[in-house]
């Protein structure tokens, strides 16, 4: 009988959580490995390196400032949101763009700051 991936997946889907746990334990014992996620073993210096290597940033609107209409227009241009959604975002604050490259995040911040908003890049 040939190995059939679809049948194997169907068999896994039919198993209970307890049966899956026992299967994982048996596989760990058989192959001499663990399924636990590796914990960061690096010293405190490793955290500093990770912060320096950050390539994606979130652009967060803190407040609209005095010129709310201009900020709403910029938010609409940047995000492509409708008028109501952009207004709600400007009124409540929040993430304008997630996981943006550094250059793009800074450009968005400059545009919104020029419109009068208070923006933070995280």
From Swiss-Prot:
Keywords: Ribonucleoprotein, Ribosomal protein. GO terms for cellular component: cytosolic large ribosomal subunit. The keyword Ribonucleoprotein applies. GO terms for molecular function: mRNA binding; structural constituent of ribosome. The keyword Ribosomal protein applies. InterPro entries: Ribosomal_bL12, Ribosomal_bL12_C, Ribosomal_bL12_C/ClpS-like, Ribosomal_bL12_oligo, Ribosomal_bL12_oligo_N_sf. Pfam families: Ribosomal_L12, Ribosomal_L12_N. One of its GO terms (biological process) is translation. It comes from the Bacteria. Belongs to the bacterial ribosomal protein bL12 family. Forms part of the ribosomal stalk which helps the ribosome interact with GTP-bound translation factors. Is thus essential for accurate translation. NCBIfam families: L12. Homodimer. Part of the ribosomal stalk of the 50S ribosomal subunit. Forms a multimeric L10(L12)X complex, where L10 forms an elongated spine to which 2 to 4 L12 dimers bind in a sequential fashion. Binds GTP-bound translation factors. This is Large ribosomal subunit protein bL12. The gene is rplL.
């Amino acid at each position: 009988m040939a190995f059939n991936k679809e049948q194997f997946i169907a068999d896994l889907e039919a198993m209970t959580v307890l049966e899956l746990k026992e299967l994982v334990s048996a596989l760990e014992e058989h192959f001499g490995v663990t399924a636990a996620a590796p914990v960061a073993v690096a010293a405190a210096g490793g955290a500093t390196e990770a912060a320096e290597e950050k390539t994606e940033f979130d652009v967060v609107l803190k407040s609209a400032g005095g010129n709310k209409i201009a900020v709403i227009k910029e938010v609409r241009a940047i995000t492509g949101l409708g008028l109501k959604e952009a207004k709600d975002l400007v009124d409540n604050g929040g993430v304008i763009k997630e996981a943006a490259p550094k250059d793009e995040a800074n450009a968005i911040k400059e545009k919104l700051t020029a419109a009068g908003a208070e923006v933070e890049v995280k």
